C-alpha cells in the first residue's frame, strides 16, 4: 500500500498515512479471522508457525527492496535464506515463496521484459528444486552413503556423516574467505546464503538427538543417517505420480528395483532389500495422472467425480474432469469460499449439499447451489460453523486485486504468483485421492494470506474512488470505516466456532479408551485420529500410563515394533517373540496365502514359526527368482490354558464355565501384512498374561475374524477365550456387563 499510495520524494499527507495504515490493519485482521488460519492458530499443529515464516520472508524481501541500492542491503537476502532454512524444520510449504521472492528481486534490479520474467521464473524453480531435492534430501543422502562406507570399514554410526559435515563446513569457510578476499560479491552472497540456509536446516539435528534418547514417542526412529533420510523423504506416506503415471485400472506388467535400503542393527548397517517399483501397462498410463489409486472406495469416487459410467475405462477427459471438479473445486475453491464468502457447517463432506459447502448468507444465491435454506432443521441452522460473510471479503479482495494491477502491475504479479504457488501449485503437487481423512484447507493458508493482501489494498481502492467526490482525508476515513466492517463480520461469525475452550471430545474419548482397559493392557488403535489423543493424555496428563497403545498403521514398520518391545512409562515391553532380523523392513512386509491343502485348524504357534523361518523349504519362489515366506493355511488354533485365564482374571468369575479349550478362527484375506503377523504373534504367545484389546473404531479387516472372541468392556473389545453366540442384531462379541458398568460409572 505504501508503494501505491505514497508519492515518491514527497512528504505523505494525513490521508495517505491513514489509507496505508488502514490497508494494513484491514488486511491483517481479515487474515486473522479467516476460517482456515484462525483454526490453525488455535490448534497444536505446525501450520500457524509455517504461516509465520511465510509472512516474515515476504516482509523481509520488501524490506530488502526498500534498501536494495544501499551497501549492506544483502543482509536481508541472507536473513531470508536463514529463515528458509529454519522453516524447513517446520514445514516445506514456505519454500513455495521462492518464485515470488525471485520476482521481487527481478523487478527491483532489472527493467521489465517477458523474457526476463521467464528466466527469473526458471531460475527460481531451479533454486526451489535444489533446496527441495539437493539440500533437504540430497545433503543427508550423500552423508548417509559416506556413513555407510565408514561403517563398513569398521567405524561407528555417524562417523562418516560427521566427517562429511566437517568437509562441507571447511569448504564453505574457505569459499566465503576466498570470495571476500577476491571481492567476488555474487559468489560471496551465494555462499553466505547457502551457509545460513544450512545453519537453519541444522534445526533437524534435534530430531536425531531426541531419537537417540529413545523417548516413548519416536516416529520413524531417525537415530541413524538412513533412518533420518527416510524421515525427511516422508517414505511412510508412499509415492504418487505427478507428471506421468497410471490410471487406476492399469495393470502391473513388471517391476524395477530402486535404491537399496539399509537399517542399523547392533551398530552396523545391514541391507534390507531394494525398493520395488511397479511398472504399469503403458497403454493405461497418461501425462498429468490424477486418478491413480486402486483402492475400491477411491475408484468408486473417481467415477462419481469424473462422470464415468459402469466399467467404462477412464480417459484423459475424465482425468481432467476429476482434477477440476474434485481437486480444484472441492479441495481448493470450496475452501477459498469458506474463508471469503462463508461456510455452511463444520461437517466434513464429499459433495453432499448438506455437508461442508460454502454459503454466502444471501438466500437466492445459496438456494441456487444448495437448495432452499429456510427449510433446514434447527440443528443445521444453528451449527456454530455456519458463518455468513455475504461475499464482503471476496468483493473487497477483488477490488484490491484490480486496483493493485492498475497501480503496480509488477508487485501485483508477485502477489498473484504467491497465490498460485501456495494454492493451485499445492493442489497439483498433492494429487489428492477422494475421501481424505480430514478437511485440508490448512494447506492453502498461504494462498489465503496472499488474497488478504488484496483485501487490505481494497481499502486504498475505495479511498481512491471516494476522494473524487469528497476531501481526501474524509475519503480515507470513510473508506477505513466501511472496510473495517469486513473483518468485523468475519470475527463475529467465526468467534463461536473457533473458540476451542472446553472442547474436550478427543481428550475424553482417549480417557475412555484407556479406562476401558485392564491394568498393563495392550490396546490396538486404528490410525492418527484414534492414537494421538491417547498418546497426549498419557504423555501430558499421565493417565493410564500402564496401558500400551499400539497404532496398527505404524505396526507395519520395523522401527515401531522395536519401540513397543521397550518399556514405556509404566507399561511393560510388549511380549513379541519375533527378533529384529525377522521383521526388519523389506522382510515379511507382505505374506501371501498359498493353499497347501492343510486339513483342519493348525496351531498358531507352529504357523508363526513356519512363517518366520529362514529355511528355504518354508518359502516359495517368485517369477523373478526371489524367495519369500507364505501362509500354508488360513485356519488357526490357540490352545487355551484355563488356569492362566482364571489366575489372570481374563474373564469374569461368573463366565469361567464358558472358557473354551481352543480358540479357532479363519482369516478371510489371502494375505497378511506385517502388522497382522505381529498381532498373531502376540495372541499366540501371550498366554493370557497381558490383557489385549482392540479399540471399537478399528476396522473389521484388522480384527482377523477374531470377533467371536471379543468381549465389550467399554470403548474397547477385549480378546477372551469365550466364544460369543451369533447375535442377529450385529453385536460384536459378548458383553462383560459388570466390568462395563464399572468402567462407565466409576472411571
Please report, for each region that a protein language model flagged, where it lies by residue:
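ER/secretory pathway lumenal C-terminal domains and tails of membrane proteins involved
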Residues: 7-10, 37, 42-51, 56-79, ...
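Short helix- or helix-capping micro-motifs
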Residues: 24-32, 84
Amino acid at each position: 500500500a505504501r508503494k501505491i499510495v505514497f508519492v515518491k520524494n514527497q512528504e505523505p499527507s494525513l490521508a495517505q498515512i491513514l489509507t496505508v495504515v488502514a490497508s494494513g490493519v484491514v488486511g491483517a485482521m481479515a487474515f486473522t479471522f479467516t476460517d482456515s488460519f484462525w483454526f490453525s492458530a488455535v490448534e497444536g499443529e505446525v501450520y500457524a508457525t509455517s504461516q509465520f515464516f511465510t509472512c516474515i520472508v515476504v516482509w523481509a524481501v520488501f524490506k530488502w527492496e526498500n534498501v536494495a541500492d544501499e551497501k549492506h542491503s544483502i543482509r536481508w537476502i541472507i536473513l531470508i535464506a536463514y529463515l528458509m532454512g529454519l522453516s524447513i524444520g517446520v514445514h516445506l510449504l514456505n519454500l513455495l515463496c521462492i518464485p515470488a521472492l525471485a520476482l521481487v528481486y527481478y523487478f527491483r534490479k532489472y527493467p521489465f521484459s517477458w523474457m526476463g520474467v521467464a528466466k527469473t521464473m526458471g531460475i527460481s524453480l531451479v533454486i526451489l528444486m535444489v533446496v527441495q531435492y539437493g539440500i533437504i534430501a540430497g545433503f543427508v543422502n550423500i552423508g548417509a552413503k559416506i556413513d555407510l562406507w565408514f561403517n563398513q570399514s569398521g567405524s561407528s554410526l555417524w562417523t562418516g556423516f560427521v566427517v562429511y559435515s566437517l568437509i562441507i563446513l571447511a569448504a564453505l569457510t574457505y569459499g566465503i574467505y576466498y570470495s571476500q578476499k577476491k571481492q567476488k560479491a555474487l559468489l560471496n552472497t551465494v555462499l553466505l546464503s547457502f551457509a545460513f540456509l544450512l545453519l537453519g536446516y541444522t534445526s533437524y539435528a534435534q530430531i536425531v538427538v531426541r531419537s537417540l534418547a529413545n523417548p516413548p514417542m519416536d516416529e520413524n526412529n531417525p537415530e541413524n543417517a538412513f533412518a533420518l533420510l527416510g524421515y525427511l523423504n516422508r517414505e511412510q506416506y508412499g509415492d504418487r505420480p505427478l507428471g506421468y503415471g497410471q490410471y487406476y485400472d492399469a495393470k502391473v506388467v513388471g517391476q524395477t528395483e530402486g535404491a537399496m535400503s539399509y537399517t542399523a542393527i547392533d551398530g552396523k548397517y545391514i541391507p534390507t532389500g531394494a525398493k520395488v517399483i511397479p511398472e504399469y501397462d503403458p497403454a493405461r498410463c497418461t501425462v498429468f495422472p490424477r486418478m491413480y489409486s486402486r483402492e475400491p472406495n477411491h475408484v468408486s469416487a473417481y467415477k462419481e467425480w469424473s462422470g464415468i459410467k459402469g466399467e467404462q475405462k477412464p480417459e484423459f477427459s475424465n482425468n481432467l474432469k476429476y482434477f477440476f471438479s474434485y481437486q480444484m473445486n472441492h479441495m481448493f475453491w470450496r475452501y477459498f469460499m469458506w474463508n471469503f464468502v462463508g461456510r455452511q457447517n463444520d461437517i466434513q463432506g464429499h459433495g453432499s449439499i448438506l455437508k461442508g459447502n460454502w454459503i454466502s448468507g444471501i438466500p437466492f444465491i445459496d438456494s441456487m447451489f444448495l437448495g432452499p435454506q429456510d427449510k433446514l432443521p434447527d440443528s443445521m441452522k444453528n451449527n456454530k460453523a455456519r458463518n455468513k460473510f455475504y461475499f464482503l471479503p471476496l468483493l473487497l479482495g477483488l477490488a484490491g486485486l484490480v486496483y493493485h494491477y492498475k497501480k503496480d502491475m509488477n508487485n501485483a504479479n508477485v502477489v498473484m504468483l504467491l497465490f498460485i504457488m501456495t494454492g493451485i501449485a499445492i493442489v497439483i503437487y498433492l494429487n489428492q485421492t477422494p475421501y481424505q481423512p480430514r478437511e485440508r484447507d490448512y494447506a492453502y493458508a498461504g494462498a489465503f494470506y496472499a488474497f488478504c493482501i488484496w483485501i487490505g489494498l481494497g481499502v486504498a481502492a475505495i479511498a481512491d474512488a471516494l476522494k473524487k467526490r469528497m476531501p481526501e482525508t474524509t475519503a480515507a476515513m470513510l473508506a477505513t470505516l466501511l472496510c473495517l466492517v469486513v473483518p468485523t463480520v468475519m470475527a463475529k461469525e467465526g468467534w463461536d466456532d473457533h473458540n476451542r475452550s472446553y472442547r474436550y471430545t478427543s481428550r475424553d474419548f482417549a480417557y475412555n479408551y484407556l479406562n476401558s482397559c485392564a491394568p498393563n493392557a495392550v490396546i490396538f488403535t486404528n490410525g492418527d485420529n484414534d492414537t494421538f489423543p491417547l498418546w497426549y493424555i498419557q504423555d501430558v496428563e499421565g493417565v493410564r500410563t500402564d496401558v500400551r497403545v499400539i497404532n496398527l498403521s505404524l505396526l507395519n514398520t520395523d522401527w515401531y515394533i522395536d519401540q513397543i518391545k521397550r518399556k514405556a512409562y509404566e507399561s511393560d515391553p510388549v511380549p513379541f517373540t519375533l527378533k529384529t532380523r525377522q521383521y526388519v523392513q523389506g522382510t515379511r512386509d507382505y505374506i501371501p496365502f498359498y493353499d497347501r491343502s492343510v486339513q483342519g485348524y493348525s496351531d498358531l504357534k507352529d504357523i508363526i514359526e513356519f512363517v518366520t523361518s529362514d529355511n528355504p523349504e518354508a518359502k516359495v519362489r517368485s517369477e523373478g527368482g526371489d524367495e519369500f515366506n507364505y501362509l500354508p493355511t488360513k485356519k488357526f488354533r490357540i490352545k487355551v490354558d484355563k488356569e492362566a485365564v482364571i489366575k489372570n482374571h481374563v474373564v469374569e468369575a461368573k463366565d469361567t464355565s464358558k472358557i473354551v479349550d481352543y480358540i479357532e478362527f479363519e482369516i478371510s484375506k489371502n494375505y497378511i501384512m506385517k502388522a497382522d503377523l505381529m498381532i498373531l504373534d502376540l495372541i499366540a504367545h501371550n498366554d493370557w498374561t497381558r490383557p489385549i484389546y482392540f479399540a471399537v473404531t478399528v476396522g473389521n479387516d484388522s480384527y482377523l475374524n477374531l470377533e467371536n472372541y471379543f468381549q465389550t468392556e467399554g470403548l474397547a473389545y477385549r480378546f477372551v477365550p469365550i466364544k460369543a453366540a451369533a447375535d442377529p442384531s450385529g453385536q460384536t462379541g459378548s458383553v462383560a456387563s459388570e466390568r462395563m458398568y464399572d468402567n462407565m460409572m466409576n472411571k
